[in-house]
């Protein structure tokens, strides 16, 4: 089993291959809903390495692995010597002798690439600072469930255009031929290297990078994410002031001409005061809602949580693709 069976970033795949992942995920969702067992990998063992905290990714990989019949071991940042007392390369070689697959969620893209290179087993990128590829299969699965197609659709991402989700949305939309708009202040627009990758792998559609929120007018899908990424050290007040004009609220939705526009969020979302961080932000800065208002979140919660559920089915598809010939 080689690095080729790993799932590291979206640009490693063609339009057809990404569509195949999505179609397979939809089949797994049907099996789950109908309670049809699909323990295709009984007796295999996978490791889940988490340097960053997680709700959806950890839960999805755990349940997906168990549904597929595998034994799942969680390895948190305080559980193993990853890069501390043992090099990442040595860790990869050790884990590769014991596990049939490895999920990694952490900071550097280089880390997940090294795991894939030296472990000798499939490695799945659960999130790095650069890419979030498993999220994309779930996101565009949700888009296909809603619209039944990708052709002639336009997706607009509003917020921090330099984060991993924005990067992944930009390149995946380009690969699938979806018109994609990254709407963000100039200070937070995608790196030129990421835009170049999107253009290199573009199959159809248009790529737009702008700071003008009027660009939402002809969109079919609006997407946002938290304004400060995990581990990022920034002036929070400065970031809020910069991104508040890009909040998805009813006033912004009123500017969208498509009546059935889809609103997505990869979660977690700061839309109310029901979190410790949300209350802290309110006490310090006076804002009850950040990237999306609570009214919009509640109105579109069904599809947002559908998107979250689809992490499970899409991760099954990704792991099945890697392990089916083991």
Swiss-Prot record:
It is an enzyme of class 2 (transferase). One of its GO terms (biological process) is arginine biosynthetic process via ornithine. Keywords: Amino-acid biosynthesis, Arginine biosynthesis, Cytoplasm, Transferase. L-ornithine binds at residues 164, 225, 229-230. Pfam families: OTCace, OTCace_N. One of its GO terms (molecular function) is ornithine carbamoyltransferase activity. It is found in: Cytoplasm. It catalyses: carbamoyl phosphate + L-ornithine = L-citrulline + phosphate + H(+). One of its GO terms (cellular component) is cytoplasm. Its main location: cytoplasm. Carbamoyl phosphate binds at residues 54-57, 81, 105, 132-135, 266-267, 311. InterPro entries: Asp/Orn_carbamoyltranf_P-bd (IPR006132), Asp/Orn_carbamoylTrfase (IPR006130), Asp/Orn_carbamoylTrfase_sf (IPR036901), Asp_carbamoyltransf_Asp/Orn-bd (IPR006131), Orn/put_carbamltrans (IPR002292), OTCase_ArgI (IPR024904). Its EC number is 2.1.3.3. Pathway: Amino-acid biosynthesis; L-arginine biosynthesis; L-arginine from L-ornithine and carbamoyl phosphate: step 1/3. PANTHER family: ORNITHINE CARBAMOYLTRANSFERASE, CATABOLIC, ORNITHINE CARBAMOYLTRANSFERASE, MITOCHONDRIAL. Reversibly catalyzes the transfer of the carbamoyl group from carbamoyl phosphate (CP) to the N(epsilon) atom of ornithine (ORN) to produce L-citrulline. Belongs to the aspartate/ornithine carbamoyltransferase superfamily. OTCase family. NCBIfam families: orni_carb_tr (TIGR00658), PRK00779.1 (NF001986). This is Ornithine carbamoyltransferase. The gene is argF.
